[in-house]
């Protein structure tokens, strides 16, 4: 009988097998869904987990060259767009530049009390795609960490380190985990560490697939977001509430992604 690592439940836990699909690597992996909090958990984490993150193929490690070396004029235009969408500096130019499809992160950042000089950490950032996009839009104090990148990256005032979350000592005004929390073992210890890395009255953003979703109910073990064995936990809203309370966070907002049926949770540590 499997015991849930989130709520401790042992009753009515459903066990099932999932295959690795992204790279068609050999192997099947045993998961279970907690009958109480509905968190989906990988039972045995492979000792060679890094082999399932091939640096030349894994999507988050592929960085477009135009994100690293943007033109100064283009950056100035993008900053006008950021002023309009994030910081509500309304003007005609910002309005025109914001017509049409814009990057989703504008909707996340306008919810938190930050500015262009705020210290921002992206945990599990891969090659830094999002950080370089933010740099193009005017943000100046950007840090990322990822244990699976080949080496540190220092380009255009964006600093990305090959390290684990428990190796970080600095504190930050805002921390993001964009589809990385589901890759991390010991989720409660991770949240407690993140709590300690935030400055007072700061915010943590976690974007994850959630188990209490239409896609899990509809596709079952064929749901792409299971992503065995890279996803160690597929949390539910209930499991995230349990963890956040134990770590000392207060949940300020929960947003369900319409396109991917994924969840976004915004926490504050004070």
Tell what function each PLM region has:
Residues 179-183:
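A short His-aromatic
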Residues 18-24, 252-270:
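Conserved catalytic loop of SAM-dependent methyltransferase domains
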Residues 142, 204-206:
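Hydrophobic/aromatic residues located in beta-strands of well-ordered beta-sheets
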Residues 1-178, 188-191, 256:
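Conserved N-terminal segment of class I S-adenosyl-L-methionine
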Residues 206-233, 238-243:
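Short, glycine-/aromatic-enriched active-site segment of Class I SAM-dependent methyltransferases
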Residues 188-203:
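A short glycine-rich, Lys/Arg-flanked "PGG" loop and its adjoining helix->strand segment in the class I
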Residues 151, 211-214, 258-260:
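Feature marks short, surface-exposed loop/turn motifs that line or immediately flank catalytic pockets
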Residues 185-189, 216:
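Short N-terminal helix/helix-N-cap motif within the alpha/beta-hydrolase-1
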């Amino acid at each position: 009988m499997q015991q849930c690592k989130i709520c401790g439940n042992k009753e009515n836990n459903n066990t099932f097998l999932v295959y690795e699909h992204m790279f068609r690597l050999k192997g099947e992996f045993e998961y279970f869904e907690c009958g109480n909090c509905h968190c989906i958990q990988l039972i045995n984490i492979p000792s060679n987990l890094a082999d399932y993150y091939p640096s030349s193929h894994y999507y988050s490690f592929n960085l477009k060259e135009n994100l690293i070396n943007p033109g100064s004029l283009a950056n100035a235009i993008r900053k006008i767009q950021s002023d309009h969408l994030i910081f509500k500096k309304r003007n005609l130019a910002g309005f025109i530049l914001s017509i049409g499809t814009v990057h989703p992160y504008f909707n996340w950042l306008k919810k938190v009390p930050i500015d262009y000089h705020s210290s921002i950490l992206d945990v599990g950032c891969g090659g830094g795609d999002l950080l370089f996009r933010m740099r193009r839009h005017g943000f100046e104090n950007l840090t990322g960490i990822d244990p699976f990148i080949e080496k540190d990256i220092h380009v255009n005032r964006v600093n990305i380190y090959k390290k684990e979350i428990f190796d970080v000592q600095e504190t930050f005004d805002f921390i993001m985990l964009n589809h990385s929390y589901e890759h991390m073992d010991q989720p409660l210890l991770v949240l407690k560490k993140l709590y300690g890395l935030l400055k007072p009255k700061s915010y943590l953003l976690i974007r994850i697939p959630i188990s209490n979703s239409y896609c899990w109910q509809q596709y079952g073990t064929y749901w792409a977001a299971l992503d065995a064995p890279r996803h160690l936990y597929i949390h539910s809203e209930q499991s995230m509430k349990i963890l956040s309370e134990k770590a000392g966070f207060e949940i300020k907002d929960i947003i369900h992604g319409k396109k991917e049926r994924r969840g976004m949770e915004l926490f504050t540590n004070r």
